[in-house]
Amino acid sequence: MSNLLQAIMNIKSIQERNLGSYKGVQDSKNRMNQMGVTLEVFLKDAFCNTFDIENKDLVYSEYFSYLGNQNNPPDMILKGGDAVEVKKITGIKTSIQLNSSYPKSKLFVSDSRITEACKNCEDWEVKDIIYAIGTIPNRVLKLMFFVYGDCYAASPSIYQRIVEEVKGGLHSTGLEFSETNELGRINRVDPLGITDLRVRGMWIIKHPIKVFKNIIPPESIKNNNFNLIALMKAEKYKQFPKKDRKRIEAEDNIEVTDVKIKDPDNPAKLLDSVLVRYDEI
């Protein structure tokens, strides 16, 4: 069974991070989508340590219980472990596009947006979720930021309340409204009754570099070198196998630091957390 600490060590061990020439990815006419797909493959290889393996699918099936895509989140679920949602951006000043899914503190099997295959991939009710955010200017991976959802996002009820308020506003217009997995659909908006209006949320969240700038000064990110950052609650860090914790704590150029972050549900409360950081020299 793999985990984030093992993935970090595997990423540190390789030197080539030019995703434009990454092996095992089919070419796409859409360059932006291509980099997103390539980052997903890169991270699968990081969790499975399959950077130099030709037949990756056999190993993937050993390590992952579910593999999704941009239309079927999450992007991957580690067997007996965490869910991973991959996001690609071109600069740290760019916000993260979450599209129609609000930020997740955890992944719940009851989530209407996940597929039946995802729900049935294991016997599970709730999973920790990692947002894996890669900054890829000019097709080269420069910053890899892993942040657990419960450090980054509020409880589902916070966002669901906003969704219900928006839906309530649409209902109150007196227009013909249909419930959907999005915010809704307004039917027959023109005199012929032939046009419908889909109403969907487009959720955007700030880059964690901005959110956690008190513990990760943006100026400390070295633009010319590769940087890797991971943030999790202290209790989560302690759940990793002892051998993985010892290995990463003893590794050159990796710093493991105790930090405090604001509770996403109550900023007056501080959470004991752990920051793992690798700055390539």
Curated annotation (Swiss-Prot):
Signal peptide: none
Record protein name field: Type II restriction enzyme MthTI
Lineage top rank: taxon: Archaea
EC assignment: 3.1.21.4
Pfam families, per database record: RE_NgoPII
Naturally occurring in which organism (per UniProt): Methanothermobacter thermautotrophicus (Methanobacterium thermoformicicum)
Protein's UniProt keywords contain Cell cycle: no
Gene Ontology terms, MF aspect: DNA binding; type II site-specific deoxyribonuclease activity
Family, as annotated: Belongs to the NgoPII type II restriction endonuclease family.
Known catalytic reactions: Endonucleolytic cleavage of DNA to give specific double-stranded fragments with terminal 5'-phosphates
